[in-house]
């Protein structure tokens, strides 16, 4: 989804949950829920794994 793409880009930039929440205008709890769903969708368990997956699968291009 568009939101998940935004999250991956922000994770790649090294932003914290609080920084992501501030930038998107949502609560930190909502960020955590989005990340949990993203990790589940990608089959990963961490921010680092999510960024690695995104880079390897061309999700950060364009």
Feature roles, as predicted:
Residues 1-3:
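Short helix-coil-helix linker/hinge
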Residues 18, 55-56:
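Terminal helix-turn-helix DNA-binding modules in bacterial transcription factors
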Residues 14-49:
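Recognition helix of helix-turn-helix DNA-binding domains
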Residues 9-13, 55:
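Short, locally clustered residues in the helix-turn-helix/winged-helix DNA-binding domain
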Residues 57-62:
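…primarily DNA-binding HTH/wHTH and HhH modules…
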Residues 5-9, 49:
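Pre-recognition alpha-helix immediately N-terminal to the DNA-recognition helix
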